[in-house]
Amino acid sequence: MGMATYAVVDLETTGNQLDFDDIIQIGITFVRNNQIIDTYHSMIRTNLEIPPFIQALTSIEENMLQQAPYFNQVAQEIYDKIKDCIFVAHNVDFDLNFIKKAFKDCNIQYRPKKVIDTLEIFKIAFPTDKSYQLSELAEAHGITLANAHRADEDAATTAKLMILAFEKFEKLPLDTLKQLYYLSKQLKYDLYDIFFEMVRQYDAKPLDKSYEKFEQIIYRKQVDFKKPTTNYNGSLKSLYSKAVDQLGLTYRPQQLYLAETILDQLMHSEKAMIEASLGSGKSLAYLLAALMYNIETGKHVMISTNTKLLQSQLLEKDIPAMNEALNFKINALLIKSKSDYISLGLISQILKDDTSNYEVNILKMQLLIWITETPSGDIQELNLKGGQKMYFDQKIETYVPARHDVHYYNFIKRNAQNIQIGITNHAHLIHSDVENSIYQLFDDCIVDEAHRLPDYALNQVTNELSYADIKYQLGLIGKNENEKLLKAIDQLEKQRILEKLDIAPIDIFGLKASMNEIHELNEQLFSTIFTIINDSDVYDDDIHRFHNVFTFETKDILKDLHAIIDKLNKTLEIFNGISHKTVKSLRKQLLYLKDKFKNIEQSLKAGHTSFISIKNLSQKSTIRLYVKDYAVKDVLTKQVLEKFKSLIFISGTLKFNHSFEAFKQLFNKDVHFNTFEVNTSLQSAKNTSVFIPSDVASYQYKNIDEYVASIVSYIIEYTTITSSKCLVLFTSYKMMHMVQDMLNELPEFEDYVVLTQQQNQNYKIVQQFNNFDKAILLGTSTFFEGFDFQANGIKCVMIAKLPFMNKHNAKYWLMDSEFTSTFKEYVLPDAVTRFRQGLGRLIRSENDRGIIVSFDDRLINSNYKNFFEQTLENYRQKKGDIQQFGKLLRQIQKKKK
């Protein structure tokens, strides 16, 4: 890092409009030689009003600035401190432009010689971080940030993270550092000087034994699993007793019974369904059963879970805790499909790609660092999004494996016999095929949260043709000889002529004409679909915020598909007899497109269930065509039921109408299942009241405003009496946002944080909700399950409507052909299951007390009410108006104390 001084600057302002807003706080942390050497901080007075949002964000109020200097009073002092420093900030353009403008207003011309953006640094240094927001970076790297959005603390935190990043860079192998230096020349800011100094000052030494080299890539050496040596001669009961004792848990006979039941089914190669009530301690039970099975038989067990969160909990928390408690070394590994793991040949190809793109350049640098760290090569560790993900996916699709390639999936195959417990998820379990031979090495499988399997199976059997995807894939080939893969082919043809390469001539002009025609045919195809949408009945899917067309003629679509497939075939003929790697990449891309169109064509010709979706009715670019290729029952039977000798399905909500029959009907093979129920919810249900308002009118679309107002009234009553947090569940984004708008306008909620479900932000929102004492979380179907509601006071879940899927929902349409009565056999069981999962958000421990409010009077007035009443039979139920609701809250509050 040398002896340069870095001025790490953070500003708080009245807003983000450069020509209007003012600085109200400045914090500077000075760094030299990886040490903080000085700090500067000042509030800055302004004549502008500070907007309420900025006051809430920064905790800076106008009275705090009354004694502060104006910027022109400290401008010279600040300038003198930073004029010779490298200017550093997180999202540097904002801070740099504001401070340059402020200096200019004081007749000071500030032009830093070098500028560094820590957002750029942190993306490169920490390639697996889920977020690059300062507060989340600080949390991820163990740095305390007590007051985010305060300039002094933000500047200090940014500086500490920058030091961590620089120290990480300095420890990298020299070859990696050199490649980072060359790539950094294409960045927006002056990081290349930093890398140059690091390379120049590098203490030359042999490559550390923990690394190996593939071509130009330095990567972390993979360490094989040792054969497990779990010496234990006792019973499962004594193993369970030791585990709960060492872990400080309560000995629960029902939890032991669950573990013993699972072990017995594994030992006898049985198929079983187990409903273990929410909060019964399923994870510990099945982990101990799987471990005991391995100890007694030497066989390993696959455990499939619903979410990445639960996967991480098992591998990073539960299994390490068991190892410590039992003094074992359990070999457990996350297992996915082959395509989820990196190959070094693919990284090499990406590094050699001359695509001139900022995000691609960042990706190359991230890959160089990530591959020195990752023990697994799991691509999802990179959390790729947007353009980076699309680029990476395309590179995977067109990658022609290099000779002597190193593929991380082979490490898992090599170590499979020494893995005692394999952890996967439902999507991978269902997707696995013959090529994914790792799955064939497991004879025994435990499926947790098994009620979610049908959703993943439906995703697996549904094929999609998206305008945006096809347009992107075609764009990667290009339209002329100056773009993408066509440019590479053009250069190859020139090389053939100049260097007399031993390959057949390539018809560049014919190829260019063909690609232009393919682009035009694709536009014609989606224009045809767009016309069909405009001429058809369109139904809104509010949950997914799409518009769907379910009934349409396919003749014109098939005609356009045939034309584009025919043109792709003729284009592929241009490369007959040419085996050069550049040609192979283009052929692979063209074949990918051809297969995409061909699969859709074959399914439509066969009359498979299909529908058209469009996000914006006026934009052709948002069109997607979906076709269901296979029956969900066929896939679940083939990919799950027939794959394992012993198979145990576990969930808190497998039963419907006191029976497992609804779940059994998801398989098309008559197989005997042993069924068990482990119910620990009886005691916790006694701590829960279910309240059904009598003063809320039955929901009708025309009275939605009145219905929403009633929900808000009950939220007001609840928060006024309890001052506690509340989860409100909806089946419609429209209703959710109507409630949000009303809450934000009411003075009763000025000291409450109102959080709303957002795409790809659920985990973060849940964290925020659990951290605040006064919070209201508004969510849709996602939050009916898989969400641990934490609160010190009374817990409340309000259910706006019973979670039925609408008959215009795509799932309803796609599954309709698989049932005699879709509502009775699929929709109703699904709604009851989701309702039960919603109840489970409330009571997660014996000490929890809470209340469930269901506004939907179908719970007690419909002809299917008894199916829901069965789920509530252990709960205390009360029907009444809002005054009686308030009275009940006070009673619960009194008991809680």
Curated annotation (Swiss-Prot):
InterPro entries linked to this entry: ATP-dep_Helicase_C, DinG, DnaQ, Exonuclease_RNaseT/DNA_pol3, Helic_SF1/SF2_ATP-bd_DinG/Rad3, P-loop_NTPase, RNaseH-like_sf, RNaseH_sf
Domain Helicase ATP-binding: start-end pairs: 241-496
NCBIfam families reported for this sequence: dinG_rel (TIGR01407), dnaq (TIGR00573)
Short motif DEAH box, span: 448-451
GO BP terms in the entry: DNA replication proofreading
Molecular-function annotations in GO: 3'-5' exonuclease activity; ATP binding; DNA binding; DNA-directed DNA polymerase activity; helicase activity; hydrolase activity, acting on acid anhydrides, in phosphorus-containing anhydrides
Listed PANTHER family: DNA POLYMERASE III SUBUNIT EPSILON
Keywords: ATP-binding, Exonuclease, Hydrolase, Nuclease, Nucleotide-binding
Protein's name according to its UniProt entry: 3'-5' exonuclease DinG
Organism: Staphylococcus aureus (strain MSSA476)
Gene3D superfamilies referenced in this protein's UniProt entry, alphabetically: P-loop containing nucleotide triphosphate hydrolases (3.40.50.300), Ribonuclease H-like superfamily/Ribonuclease H (3.30.420.10)
The family this protein is said to belong to: Belongs to the helicase family. DinG subfamily. Type 2 sub-subfamily.
SMART domains noted in UniProt: EXOIII (SM00479), HELICc2 (SM00491)
Residue stretches making up the Exonuclease domain: 8-161
Protein residues bound to ATP: 276-283
Residue ranges of domain Helicase C-terminal in the record: 703-893
Function according to Swiss-Prot or TrEMBL: 3'-5' exonuclease.
GO cellular component terms, semicolon-separated: cytosol
Annotated EC: 3.1.-.-
Keyword Cell division: no
